[in-house]
């Protein structure tokens, strides 16, 4: 019940501002790409955060606060530091995802002769991860853009907020590049599947063509009409077999000359 209520609050509004307070709702990604909704309430320089689980972004930020408390005189400073840390984490996730895309690309190139359905599953999984990261950083961009419009937020923190926005825009470019690479890999995979299917169809087509003349010859001599001298010929059976073999060899030679095989 509490999870549903928090999700409803989080979805209803990312940012609410009154005369002296800010309520910001944002999703923080875990290492397993699950989203953790976090609610921030800041009033008179005091920051309160509401979340269900521990997050690395908070732990790292708290360490920075304890090491040098002078750099964090108010909750506004802590809030900005939290978003800075979170964006850095998002950048690390994008870098890890990019490495996975590179490995997948190498795997597809190495297995170009035999494609596996598991590769397509991996592509879809990476597409989902990139989508989640993009949604996450878009969420941060929306909240920080609203904070920049706040008239009582400390002006000294505006440059840092602006820098976060620039970093987020850079991450958008990386996610777009990731989408492009994954689309290319998906097209490559489907192309390899088509090539493999065409090879199979080609093999069956060649087999059908090769055995078509022998089948025709066998069918002709299987008619058993009265006026078929070969049926009563001593070497008729060998003649039919030889004719079948000759037709197969002839077709194979034609295919070789035409470079169809």
PLM region spans:
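N-terminal pre-transmembrane cytosolic regions of membrane proteins
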Residues: 1-6, 65
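Extended, Lys/Arg-enriched charged tracts that mediate electrostatic binding to polyanionic substrates
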Residues: 4-34
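Proline-rich low-complexity regions
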Residues: 12-14, 92, 138-139, 229
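Aromatic-residue hotspot detector
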Residues: 16-17, 91, 109, 225, ...
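Extended amphipathic alpha-helical scaffolding segments in membrane-proximal extra-membrane regions
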Residues: 19, 27-192
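Hydrophobic alpha-helical transmembrane segments and their immediately adjacent juxtamembrane loops
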Residues: 169-261
């Amino acid at each position: 019940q509490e999870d549903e209520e928090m999700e409803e609050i989080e979805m209803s509004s990312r940012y609410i501002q009154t005369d002296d307070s800010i309520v910001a709702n944002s999703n923080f990604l875990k290492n397993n790409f699950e989203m953790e909704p976090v609610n921030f309430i800041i009033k008179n320089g005091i920051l309160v955060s509401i979340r269900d689980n521990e997050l690395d972004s908070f732990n790292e930020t708290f360490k920075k606060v304890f090491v040098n408390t002078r750099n964090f005189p108010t909750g506004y400073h802590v809030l900005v530091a939290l978003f800075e840390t979170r964006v850095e984490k998002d950048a690390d996730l994008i870098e890890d995802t990019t490495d996975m895309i590179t490995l997948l690309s190498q795997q597809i190139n190495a297995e170009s002769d035999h494609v596996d359905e598991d590769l397509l599953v991996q592509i879809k999984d990476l597409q989902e991860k990139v989508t989640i990261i993009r949604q996450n950083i878009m969420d941060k961009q929306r909240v920080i853009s609203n904070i920049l419009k706040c008239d009582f937020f400390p002006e000294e923190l505006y440059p840092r907020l602006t820098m976060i926005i620039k970093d987020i825009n850079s991450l958008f470019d990386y996610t777009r590049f990731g989408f492009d690479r994954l689309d290319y890999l998906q097209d490559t995979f489907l192309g390899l599947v088509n090539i493999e299917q065409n090879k199979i169809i080609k093999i069956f087509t060649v087999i059908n063509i090769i055995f078509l003349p022998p089948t025709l010859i066998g069918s002709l001599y299987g008619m058993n009409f009265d006026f078929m001298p070969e049926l009563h010929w001593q070497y008729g059976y060998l003649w039919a077999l030889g004719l079948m073999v000759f037709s197969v060899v002839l077709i194979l030679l034609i295919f070789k000359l035409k470079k169809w095989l």
